[in-house]
């Protein structure tokens, strides 16, 4: 699973479409969030979109590269969170729905 944040609905939609079209993700969930962070020595607060990207661990490098190339931020949050365990039929579907998983 990969987590990323974007600052606009337009950038969100571009990233989602590209990841799904390229079969780099089986599912992407989005949440409207408020982010609080330090940037260039200043405390900032902005509305963002959180992307929860369901993918396989072995596709992370491709997912990261795709997001990096499409992202509107200079330094994008792109982090992988391991899926330790899960409902087997769901994990099978995730595998079958992504690149080279079929």
What are the residue ranges of the model-derived segments?
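Positively charged, small/polar-rich N-terminal and surface patches that mediate targeting and assembly
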Residues: 1-102
């Amino acid at each position: 699973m990969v987590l990323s944040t974007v600052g606009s609905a337009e950038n969100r939609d571009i990233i989602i479409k590209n990841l799904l079209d390229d079969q780099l993700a089986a599912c992407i969930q989005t949440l409207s969030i408020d982010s609080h962070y330090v940037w260039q020595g200043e405390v900032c607060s902005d509305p963002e979109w959180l992307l929860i990207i369901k993918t396989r661990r072995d596709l992370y490098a491709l997912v990261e590269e795709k997001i990096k190339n499409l992202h509107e931020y200079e330094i994008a949050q792109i982090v992988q969170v391991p899926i330790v365990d899960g409902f087997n039929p769901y994990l099978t579907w995730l595998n079958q729905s992504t690149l080279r998983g079929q």
